[in-house]
Structures are given as structure tokens and as C-alpha cells.
Amino acid sequence: MGFVRDEDLEWGPEGIEERIREGLLGYHDMPPLGVGRVVPEEYFERFGGVFPESVLYIWRRFGFVGFGQGRSWITDPVEWAPVVDAWLEGIEVPFPPQRWHCVTRTALGYMRLWGEISGPALKVDVIDGTIRPSSSVAGDMADPVLAERIGCITFTSPLEDLYDDEVSGRPVAVEGIERLGVPGAAEVFGFVPPLSFGGRISGDRLSVQKAVPYLVGLAQSTPRYLGVDLMAAWGGAATQFLIDQGAIPNSTGTSDGPSAPDTVGDPDNQDGPGGSGGPAGSGGFGGGL
């Protein structure tokens, strides 16, 4: 199919390599663990019409591998399909019916899901059961150039766990790595017992678990719910404030409420290169997406 090119935005191999250097390896300081598992050639045929070329390029570049001592991973969407099915079962997401794939995840199992229509518009927090949509990402996927950008940023602004140890204040995933070692490609750190049964977030409660069966079981024991679309909510509040101040006319809203701001293809509008607060941004897989 080939990369989509635009005179102002080019997301070919050179641009992706720059993002890898400046974002993934530079700003985020997340080098790969080593040589990743090679992505099977049939995956490029299966997903060639699903993911933009930027995603397929990164697959060829890295394979399925972990970054930053296993804090973030590029996942095999076929192997992780049972996990996705378990976490989305019974949840009505605000997007057209489509197949969802896990493309990145963290040491604790926090997942980014890519819809075959809506792109990487869902994040799943397996700790608190939140499935969080992003309508701004889904809307940008209609633009082929922005879709290439979204694909690039999804992998070069890596997803990270958001939870800190309630005693030490340090990232609980980092404490898990220090105590248990780097998790493998088929492993996650899980709380024992799961936090859905109560207790504090503490690194000494973590153990190494087989990722797929553990997360499928966790989906069955953890209350799951659709979270707030933060960018849409923020955009609506910001627009209403401007209307109240008389800065913009009320006609800028629609019958469904004020429109959200344009995030120009950033999966999270996060800090980091390409995000709103990063050195290359206009203001990622970062949890920071």
C-alpha cells in the first residue's frame, strides 16, 4: 500500500526513525530489551488493510518486544485476542461495531486497543476496570496522513503504568522489576490477591503471572465499566467556558454539545515528542499515554 505523504506532514521511514530517536529512545529513555520476536509474514497480509504503514514499519523494525526493562511492550494482537474479548465483553463502546486488537501493553497489563475502524481509541486499565475511549483519535483516523502519524506516535510514545506504590511513592512497576526481574513477553505482574478484592497498591504484593490466562481471569473478577472520554469532556468544558465569556458565539456548539478541540492525531495529547508538552509538540504510548 505504501506510506501516505503530504507536503507538510510526512510519516515515512525517515520521520519514524526520527521519532524513535527523539521520542522512544531519547525523551522516554526506553530502549528495547533486545532482538524482538519476528512478526510472522502472514501478519502483514492479515493486518495490511487494518493498520497504517507506520505500524507495519515498526513491526518490521522491532518485532514483538519489550522496552524500558519490560515496562512497555509491542504485543502480538493474535495472541492477545482472548484478553481483548474478555475485557470488552458486555461493554458498549461509543464507536461503530468493529474488531479490536491489543497493540501495546505495560508490565501490569494496561492495554491500548486498536479498532479496525477507529484506530487506537481504547485504553484498558486492568487495575481499576476502566475502559477509556478517545473520540478525537477515532475522528482523526479518517485522514490518511493523520492515521500514519497516530500509528507512529502509538509506538514511539510508549504506554506506561500509572500506579505508584502507596508506601514508597515509587512506580509500582519499577518496584516489581527490581524485586521480580524483567517480565517476559508472555508475562505480566499481577497483584495477589487482585486489587478488586481490596488492599493497598504495593510492590510487595506483585507476582509474575502468565499474561493471557491471568488477564482473562482478571476480567471476570474485576468490575468493568466505560470511562469518561477525557479529551471530549475537556473540550466541551473549555468550549462552554469560552461561550460563557463571550469569546466565541454559542453557534459553535452542535445539538450534541460543544465540539472537542483538535488534537491533530495524538493518541493521548500527552507530554513527549509529538504530544502537547513535548519538545517536538505544538504546545503518546504514554501514560504520562
Regions found by a protein language model. Give the residues of each.
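Mixed-charge (acidic/basic) macromolecular-recognition segments
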Residues: 147-212, 216
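Compact, glycine/acidic-enriched structural inserts
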Residues: 122-165
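Long, low-complexity, intrinsically disordered segments
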Residues: 263-289
